[in-house]
Amino acid sequence: MSELLKVTNVTKKYHHFKALNNVSMTLESGKIIGLLGPNGSGKTTLIKIINGLLKDYEGEVLVDGKNVGIDSRKIISYLPDENYFQDWMYIKDVLSIFSDLYEDFDKENCLTLMNRFKLDKGMKIKEMSKGMKEKFQLSLVMSRKAKL
């Protein structure tokens, strides 16, 4: 198996607080891992670095052999912990955006997952509960054929 993710000596500081201190890990393609730790231990910080959302860190992160950037984002499917849709949007708008943005997005799979969650593409984001929005976001990220 090939190395899908390699994190080497990553340190991230927020002013004087070290959120990550010399973290190293590898993940082989085809493997599933859990990232466990107490609140404030740097799990979210590490995930954001891997996704290219945080840039000011020390060390090296390689995704499929490449530095974090535009190419790595194409093979990562990320579920943020906050809603990132605009209230005026409809589900069908977001489906169209995802289809345009991600070559690996499987719209039919997304619609199947949405059906399981009892979500309709005619629904307006503003009218959805927090739980419904979370189910929709999960449907979106699970419908990409991303490597990571």
Annotate each PLM feature.
Residues N51:
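Helix-to-loop junction immediately C-terminal to a conserved catalytic motif
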Residues E82-Q137:
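ABC-family P-loop ATPase nucleotide-binding domains
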Residues I33-P38:
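The feature captures the beta-strand-to-loop junction immediately N-terminal to the Walker
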Residues E58-S72:
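Conserved ABC transporter NBD signature motif
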